[in-house]
């Protein structure tokens, strides 16, 4: 019996999160693919075709026995200095890094690979303001108003709690 209540509570929580929470961040696969943190990718070209916002995530896929990912300052990035890094992102070869602030970020691969072009510089922008809702002038009304759908979901979840 208690299991039913637990599932109902989980269901209600998930529904509320889906309704209320709006995810604004994106995942960027560095280099454009699954395992593209390697010396065959032009990271400057890739970054120039991306737009990064605070809250976004970078995904680095690579062979961890050969490569690593170090967050560095601009000077270390330009000179490929890997012993004065800010943060070592390397964990398991499929690693993520969240871009928390709007600012420039610099990443390099140590072990001599930075000199072969394995480095990435990006500029992170502040989150854009939410877009204004589009004002549609329609003569028809939806069959089910959005608030009715939300109410139906919550009523169903509440009834499930009572069962």
Curated annotation (Swiss-Prot):
Family annotation (CDD domains): Phytocyanin_like_1 (cd11017)
A Pfam family hit: Cu_bind_like
Subcellular location: Cell membrane
Propeptide residues according to the Swiss-Prot or TrEMBL record: 139-163
PROSITE patterns, sorted: PHYTOCYANIN
Disulphide bond pairs: 80-114
Residue ranges occupied by any Phytocyanin domain in the UniProt entry: 26-126
GO-annotated cellular components: plasma membrane; side of membrane
Stored SUPFAM superfamilies: Cupredoxins
N-terminal signal peptide: 1-25
List of glycosylated residues: 42, 63, 73, 88, 135
Functional description taken from the UniProt entry: May act as a carbohydrate transporter.
Protein name from the UniProt record: Early nodulin-like protein 20
Organism whose genome encodes this protein: Arabidopsis thaliana (Mouse-ear cress)
Classification lineage: Eukaryota, Viridiplantae, Streptophyta, Embryophyta, Tracheophyta
